[in-house]
UniProtKB/Swiss-Prot annotation:
This is Apidaecin. It is found in: Secreted. Induction: By bacterial infection. Keywords: Antibiotic, Antimicrobial, Immunity, Innate immunity, Secreted. GO terms for cellular component: extracellular region. Belongs to the apidaecin family. Antibacterial peptide active against Gram-negative bacteria. The keyword Ion transport does not apply. It comes from Bombus pascuorum.
């Protein structure tokens, strides 16, 4: 069987200072 690939949730873009 195929192993489920863990996909991390997309991180919000950090504000440029």
């Amino acid at each position: 069987g195929n192993r489920p690939v863990y996909i991390p949730p997309p991180r919000p873009p950090h504000p440029r200072l």
